[in-house]
Amino acid sequence: VNQNLYALLQSRFPADRAARCLILPGGEAVSYGALEDGVGRMAALLRAKGVQPGDRVAAQARKSPAALMLYLASLQAGAVFLPLNTAYTEAEIGYFLQDAEPRLFVQDAEALAREAESVAPLDHTHPAGPDELAALVYTSGTTGRAKGAMLSHANLAANALALVEAWGFSSSDVLLHALPIFHVHGLFVAVHCALLSGAPMLWLERFDEDAVMAALPRATVMMGVPTFYSRLLAEPRFTAEAAAHMRLFISGSAPLLESAFAAFEARTGKRILERYGMSEAQMITTNPLSGERLAGSVGYPLPGVSVRIAGGGDGGVVEIRGPSITSGYWRNAEKTRDAFTADGWFITGDIGRMDPDGRLWLSGRANDLIISGGLNVYPKEIELVLDDLPGVVESAVIGLPHPDFGEAVTAVIAGSGDEGAVIAAARAKLAAFKTPKRVIFVGDLPRNAMGKVEKAALRRQYAGLFG
């Protein structure tokens, strides 16, 4: 059996290829047949440009139907697809091109699609073995240089099949797709669920309140980062009526604030389904489709995925095993070795605890851990207290160098308030060693492309606060 992911996706396309695959804001649509034809022509063009199986194809392209076709064409041709954030500068791109050594670097997928129109479609799909690489996804690189997580055809297929089942996708779904397609969430999780189900996607170039509100009546499922949901909640047109017909709202890529979960349920009567994943493993756990979705929890391991807490008990590093997890980092044997335990489990670097029934709760990143006066402080615990205070939109708790404590607990708060009052309110609920020594008020917290708060940037900015 050909293990190529594109062969699997194609086998699930609707028998009637006139069925819509991508529906654009202007009302135009790309049928499954047109998608298939465009992919085949682009795959043939990749071959003509010298792309052989195993070669890397890098793309830093505007989100468009052509950009999606390029990804699928890369799979069909047996190349390794390398999606790059459209916000990266030339200097940043230089690192990825040097590290991955792609055969081809595409910045204009539409131009490539036009060129491919005159090429006969590739008449076969590269027969991939299960361990053959399909994609190279560079991690956000919050610690030093970004590393390229290697994902095989089998890795991607296993996760996609598990998600379709876990989230109950079918051909009667319509997915509202406003995510970027340069990362796991938008390119793999969202796209694969739709294509495996033969379902259409409402294809928005980016999240824009007007476009999302216009598309919502036709959708059944929406996937988003937490920022999408906080923006919808700030939108008066987003009412219980506007959301009533929706089957599912899914959130991931960054932690969903418990206050946002509660506000969303109060507004719509629906609970956002939060799930947990990372570039190296794709999706790991999910709250249940039917069953209790709890604020602050990322739910249960997907079928085939095993999760354990290092050191067991009430808080430790989350370690995982399963068919969707990377074999390691591109040309980086040392980082690959460091990423796995002696018995072969992948070390996520996330801190969490597990309920007896297997439900997972996360409390931050291991590298965000603050050690103050020799005591471990988990920022998430403090952030939950601060986020409940009046005037606080969102908080980020970091450790800053301190001559006496080693690290001092410091809160950076988006919002307004009085430093002394915030510290007093926190002290009423937290041990002294966990209470922020200083509170800094800002307009907005800095975020990376995935909507994650960039604590490393805050640590650099305020490094000298305590002398």
Can you describe what each PLM-predicted range is?
Residues R17-A18, P121-Y138, R145, G168-V174:
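Conserved pre-ATP/AMP-binding loop-to-beta segment of ANL
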Residues E28, A43-A91, N376:
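Conserved AMP-binding/adenylate-forming
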Residues A29-G33, A134-L161:
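Conserved AMP-binding A3 loop
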Residues L35-R41, A149-S170, A178-F182, F188, ...:
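Conserved structural elements of the adenylate-forming
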Residues A157-V174, F182-V221, E235-R237:
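Conserved AMP-binding/adenylation subdomain of ANL enzymes
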Residues A219-G224, L233-R293, S306:
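Gly/Ser/Thr-rich phosphate-binding loop
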Residues G277, G316, G322, S327-G328, ...:
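AMP-binding/adenylate-forming catalytic core of the ANL superfamily
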Residues Y300-G304, G312-A339, V377:
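Conserved ATP/PPi-binding loop(s) of AMP-dependent carboxylate-activating enzymes
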